Amino acid sequence: MKPEPQSEAELMERAQDIAGLSFAELAEEAGMTVPENLKRDKGWVGQLLEWHLGAPAGSKPQQDFAKLGIELKSIPIGYSGKPLETTFVSVAPLTGVQGLTWETSHVRNKLSRVLWVPVEGEREIPLAERRVGSPLIWSPDQEEEQILKNDWEELMELIVLGKFDQISARHGEALHLRPKAANAKALTEAYSSNGKPIKTLPRGFYLRTQFTEQILLKHYINAQSE
């Protein structure tokens, strides 16, 4: 793996250096094998980018580049230039949630500064031939932060009240909560609405594609006008 970048500028330079290259080219340099598809290797693209950008390994509560305070997110893009899937942010806490605030939450920490790396995501393009796009660095503006905070507080209130059955994909304008488990048997501890311990599927916070699309649009419109 490449050494950890020492500044945001160095990280951006590395991300710009791999823009336009195919997964096959990047995998060859990293000594990695390109899987046939991502069904069993969902995290493969992220691992490939981490190798080239010098991100310390492992999925941790802090950001990928903790020293720089930056989170790395790859984002699969379709022919239309729009994101093809929601973006995982962090696992939702289901116990010990009393007194948690947006300001100290993992979600806010992860989204405070993000290096977005768009990648070709159309399924008909063989994985090896897909290319990395032009990177962008982003922090939520005041309006975006308020939307994220409102969503997080609404969803956490339902968790605190044990209303798991009432949480649906409709909740949240930018952020939504959905089960995150490889299979339906991977249950975790939580509390029901009457305060009794229960087992339920782990949940994860995800950014909606409409929200990430707006981030990309704003950035590329600004870049063109500069």
Swiss-Prot record:
One of its GO terms (biological process) is mismatch repair. Pfam families: MutH. GO terms for cellular component: cytoplasm. The keyword DNA repair applies. It is found in: Cytoplasm. One of its GO terms (molecular function) is DNA binding. InterPro entries: DNA_mismatch_repair_MutH, DNA_rep_MutH/RE_typeII_Sau3AI, DNA_rep_MutH/T2_RE_sf, Restrct_endonuc-II-like. The keyword DNA repair applies. CDD domains: MutH-like. Keywords: Cytoplasm, DNA damage, DNA repair, Endonuclease, Hydrolase, Nuclease. Sequence-specific endonuclease that cleaves unmethylated GATC sequences. It is involved in DNA mismatch repair. Belongs to the MutH family. This is DNA mismatch repair protein MutH. The gene is mutH.
